[in-house]
């Protein structure tokens, strides 16, 4: 009788604690992803504004923009690509794909004005595209891809 009562009390205590722990862990994980997305978006906006104000999309040798891209890529231990309006990669923080053409659904959507992000929970990474919009004309002159 005492063993049965003890087993029931254990089940009543352990099951709710296990459910609570599962909910807490998943909530924390989702919040961490949202913070990462917001932080990437903020840095992406800074890079986008820098690309427009320095004229980087026409002259990609500007050291201020190159150092900012490299610094943000190092902070997030990720990769940043800058694509011009001809879908040519003009900057790759890994320096592997520069000069090549990048055609992807996400980039095309960004040229239409959408900010996209893709979350791969299994491999634990976020990929984000940010349009580079010219301040005077409002025309999208490029896309930043961050992951």
Predicted regions and their residues:
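Extreme N-terminal signal-anchor transmembrane helix of membrane signaling/transducer proteins, especially
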Residues: 1-26
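Short, hydrophobic beta-strand elements of compact beta-sandwich sensory domains
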Residues: 124-147
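Extracytoplasmic/secreted envelope proteins and their assembly/folding machinery
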Residues: 41, 48, 66-69, 129, ...
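Short loop/turn microsegments at loop-to-beta-strand junctions
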Residues: 77-79, 127-128
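Juxtamembrane membrane-water interface segments immediately C-terminal to a transmembrane helix
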Residues: 9-12, 26-49
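Short regulatory alpha-helical segment in sensory/regulatory domains of signaling proteins that mediates
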Residues: 69-76
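Extracellular/periplasmic ligand-binding regions of membrane signal-transduction receptors
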Residues: 37-63, 78, 82-97
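Extracytoplasmic/periplasmic sensor domains and loops in membrane signaling proteins
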Residues: 63-67, 88-126
């Amino acid at each position: 009788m005492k063993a049965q009562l003890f087993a029931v009390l254990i089940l009543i205590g352990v099951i709710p604690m296990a459910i609570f722990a599962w909910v807490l862990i998943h909530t924390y994980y989702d919040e961490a992803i949202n913070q990462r997305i917001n932080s990437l978006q903020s840095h992406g906006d800074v890079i986008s504004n820098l690309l427009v104000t320095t004229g980087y999309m026409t002259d990609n040798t500007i050291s201020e923009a190159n150092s900012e891209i490299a610094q943000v890529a190092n902070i997030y231990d990720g990769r940043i690509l800058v694509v011009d309006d001809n879908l040519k990669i003009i900057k790759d923080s890994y320096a592997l794909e520069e000069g090549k053409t990048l055609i992807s659904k996400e980039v095309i959507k960004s040229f239409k004005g959408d900010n996209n992000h893709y979350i791969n929970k299994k491999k634990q990474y976020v990929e984000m595209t940010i349009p580079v919009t010219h301040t005077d004309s409002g025309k999208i002159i490029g896309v930043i891809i961050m992951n």
